[in-house]
Regions:
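Secreted/periplasmic carbohydrate-active enzymes, especially glycoside hydrolases
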Residues: 1-196, 200, 204-214, 237, ...
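Substrate-binding/catalytic cleft of secreted carbohydrate-active enzymes
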Residues: 169, 178-184, 191-434, 438-458, ...
Length: 519
């Protein structure tokens, strides 16, 4: 990108490999792809059609005597094999199989994977191979009913993720990616938007295994410059994104743009339409999508559209989110619509009793406003079943050198987890209560506000395990039941002077903290 509200780091920060090949090999240099492409079609519980395409490379030799074989494995069991006739001079091999009764890749519930192996032989001797995992699935979005995976409703509840963290910037170790994914799955995500640029292939591989749906995208961010070199760069990045990641079952969408704005430089509509056509040509099996914050014609160019909206943070009122969604849906009922970004800043070291809308560009971002923001926004989003997705902005705090806000300069603090991944903010547990129904828990919000300035308080708790009882210094304050978004509240509780041990319990667990009241 030529601009963006995030840091763009340079340098080599992924693995480096030395490729040593025979004179004939499976093509390693076709847009840095694997040279092997698996295309699924007509997938159902009854059968799945798979087209296999392999590209070969030959240096100063012919491909005479070369043969390509495809093998499909279920775990370690060989299910089928198919061999090509001798490879032609176009150095391209096409094969087809039909798999009866495939075990489907079914998201986080059952991310079942097969293994596809492509073997190149010359004069009967194996000289190259590729092994890639295959997950058979079918999916679609409906403008009125939302998203479906394998024929069943599957609302995509997810987060945005920048590949950026304390001490590493973008230079992640594999365990850093794993930690991010562990935190997302603890919260209950079933999808991740890998914003706003191609991220590590290791991330895609792990999302295949974990069943997390991936939205991947090119860095066409904010502005467009009507320039042949700019256009060609966009085309090249889209080709690389699609061809390098073509076989990953977790990737269901190709993202073409984020917050492109006709009012800043040149109009981006022509380029958005061209990128859509290119993506459909390269991969007709996946829809295109864009993330927009504009009311413009390009919102209708992609197969799916989602919007970045921050009602209740950058001005406006919290309730405007639902009203705006309904107006947009009524104006364009044919569009398959989702929410790609919504969020509010929070610093875990800034706490207050009062609930006041902070200045987003100011230095005071109390945690309780972020919590309130997400509770109120999720109430509105969950009610609108026609939305095919909702992605929180964002999972982790990240670096943005141009920002002068919150407690740390150069930091976007809208994450649900801190930049170093050490502290989960209250809003993290709110979403865990709504999205994760397996890991039963109760959690007291506001526990970091230890020194209280009010004697009378409301106690707020998040629970995915039903009702809970409140105790303060051992005294019972009754039972509260969760509301429609799994929030429990005890209103008007009078604290004791001095130390107050707050404890919440139910049959699945407990949580406690200490609040100090000087009055």
């Amino acid at each position: 990108p030529i601009c963006g509200d995030f840091n763009m780091f340079g340098g080599l920060y992924r693995g480096v490999e030395l490729l040593v090949t025979e004179d004939v090999c499976i093509e390693p240099a076709y847009y840095a792809s694997s040279g092997v492409f698996f295309t699924q079609s007509d997938v159902s519980e009854k059968k799945a059609h798979l087209k296999i395409e392999a590209l070969l490379s030959a240096r100063e030799t012919t491909v005479t005597g070369c043969e390509v074989e495809f093998q499909l494995y279920d775990k370690e069991k060989l299910l089928c094999r198919v061999a090509s006739a001798e490879v032609g001079e176009d150095k391209k091999v096409m094969m087809d199989i039909v798999l009866e009764r495939p075990h489907l890749w079914d998201g986080v519930k059952n991310p079942y994977l097969y293994k596809g192996v492509v073997i190149l032989r010359k004069d009967g001797k194996e000289i190259d191979r590729r092994e890639e995992e295959i997950g058979f699935r079918y999916f679609h979005a409906d403008a009125e009913k939302g998203f479906f995976l394998n024929g069943k409703p599957y609302r995509l509840n997810g987060v945005n993720r920048h590949q950026d963290r304390a001490e590493r910037a973008s230079a992640f170790y594999p365990q850093d990616h794993d930690e991010d994914l562990d935190l997302m799955q603890e919260m209950g995500c079933n999808a991740v938007r890998l914003c706003h640029y191609p991220q590590a292939k290791y991330m895609h591989q792990q999302m295949d295994k974990r069943g997390l749906v991936a939205w991947v995208e090119i860095p066409f961010v904010n502005v467009y410059v009507n320039n042949p070199a700019y256009d060609e760069n966009l085309r090249l990045q889209l080709k690389e994104l699609i061809l390098q990641n073509y076989n990953h079952p977790c990737i269901l969408f190709w993202g073409l743009f984020n917050e492109i704005n006709s009012g800043w430089l040149d109009r981006p509509s022509r380029m958005a339409a061209e990128l859509h056509a290119l993506a459909r040509q390269l991969d007709p099996s996946r829809p295109t999508m864009g993330a927009s914050n504009q009311d413009d014609d390009f919102n209708g160019f992609t197969d799916l559209i989602a919007f970045n909206k921050y009602f209740g943070w950058y001005g406006d009122n919290m309730d405007d989110m639902g009203r705006w969604i309904d107006r947009e849906h009524a104006a364009h009922p044919e569009r398959k619509m989702g929410i790609s970004e919504y969020g509010a800043g929070a610093c875990v070291f800034q706490q207050e009793d009062s609930l006041r809308h902070p200045e987003p560009w100011g230095q005071w971002h109390p945690e309780n406003w972020q919590t309130y923001y997400h509770v109120e926004n999720w109430k509105q989003l969950q009610e609108r079943e026609f939305l095919w997705c909702n992605f929180i902005w964002c999972m982790f705090d990240f670096s943005a050198a141009g920002r002068r806000e919150g407690s740390i300069m150069g930091r976007n603090d809208k994450g649900l987890v801190t930049y170093d991944r050490k502290i989960k903010k209250d809003a993290f547990y709110f979403y865990k209560a709504n999205w994760n129904q397996e890991d039963k828990f109760v959690y007291i919000a506001g526990k970091r506000l230890v020194n209280r300035t009010r004697k009378t308080v409301d106690v707020q708790v998040f629970s995915n395990s039903g009702a809970a009882k409140l105790y303060i210094n051992g005294k019972a304050y009754g039972t509260a039941k969760p509301d429609s978004v799994n929030v429990l509240e005890w209103k008007g509780i009078v604290l004791d002077t001095g130390e107050n041990r707050i404890e919440v319990r139910n049959k699945y667990g407990a949580d406690c903290c200490v609040w100090i009241c000087p009055f």
